[in-house]
Amino acid sequence: MSKIDVSIVIPTKNAGPLLDRVLQAVFEQKTEYVYEVICVDSGSKDETLDIIRKYPCRLFQIPPEEFGHGKTRNYGAAQGTGTFIVFITQDALPAADTWLQNFID
């Protein structure tokens, strides 16, 4: 397995269909970096988990009462194996397909 350069952490809860577009854009990044996507879900009741499972994400589920903006991000970062950690929200569409490359450079 290749060394992971970047861990992208996305906290989720009831993200809805926009998450599908976000994940598609993340996985279409043009970059020299090897990256993983970590989704930390805190009790979604909609289609969020099904959407995440369509992609090669690492999914971690936590109880809703364990959610905290910083705490959840820290948990996701701790699961990552990348040299760099990047956080995005469940509704943040990357601005371009070179977003990750530009961000890390």
Predicted regions and their residues:
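Short beta-strand/loop segment that forms part of the nucleotide-sugar
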Residues: V34-G43, I62
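A conserved acidic beta->alpha catalytic loop
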Residues: D41-L49, L93
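Catalytic metal- and UDP-sugar-binding loop of GT-A-like glycosyltransferases, i.e.
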Residues: I62, I88-Q90
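Acidic helix N-cap motif at the loop->helix transition within catalytic regions
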Residues: P17-D20, D46-R53
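Glycine-rich, basic loop-to-helix element that forms the pyrophosphate-binding segment
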Residues: I62-G80
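N-proximal low-complexity "stem/linker" segments adjacent to membrane-targeting elements
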Residues: M1-F27
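Conserved donor NDP-sugar-binding/catalytic core segment of glycosyltransferases
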Residues: L93, T98-D105
